[in-house]
């Protein structure tokens, strides 16, 4: 259900964008967000080993995957990781991909995609300071801050150690 909502949201949002340089920057940000969601979905499917059609989880609008490439790559974790590492996001996600190969957890990768998206939003905000991108960057940073505060509160309530709580935070 969550993926269907994401798919409808991004497809509608991307189809309604106008022209102009600031809009192109916003579109680039949205495409990166779609790429990160598709990468996360593909990695989840590849790691689960479940016999689920990856194309059903594909969100249109990104540049990293096509429906066919996502379906093919989600069946082979090594090829998927290599595809992401060789992409325009390889530099930002490289450390997380290495950790993903070594550890057996997607959490670090998901945190790295969140941090990379925040950093990308910050970069766009400095390129076009009189556009929507600084506002998006600010909203994303505040959203991440609230999520981190919630993680700290839940961790303390559950009696987790400081190290365990810190591993759940996304810090840029």
Predicted regions and their residues:
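Extended alpha-helical surfaces
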Residues: 1-172
């Amino acid at each position: 259900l969550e993926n269907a909502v994401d798919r409808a949201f991004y497809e509608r949002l991307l189809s309604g964008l106008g022209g102009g340089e600031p809009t192109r920057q916003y579109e680039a940000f949205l495409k990166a967000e779609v790429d990160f969601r598709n990468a996360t979905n593909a990695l989840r499917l590849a790691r689960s080993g479940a016999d689920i059609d990856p194309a059903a989880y594909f969100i249109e609008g990104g540049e990293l995957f096509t429906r066919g490439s996502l379906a093919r790559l989600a069946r082979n974790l090594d090829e998927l990781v290599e595809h992401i590492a060789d992409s325009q996001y390889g530099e930002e996600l490289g450390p997380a991909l290495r950790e993903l190969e070594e550890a057996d957890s997607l959490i670090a990768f998901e945190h790295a995609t969140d941090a990379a998206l925040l950093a990308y939003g910050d970069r766009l905000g400095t390129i076009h300071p009189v556009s929507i991108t600084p506002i998006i960057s600010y909203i994303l940073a505040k959203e991440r801050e609230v999520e981190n505060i919630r993680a700290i509160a839940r961790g303390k309530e559950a009696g987790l150690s400081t190290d365990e709580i810190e591993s759940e935070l996304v810090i840029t």
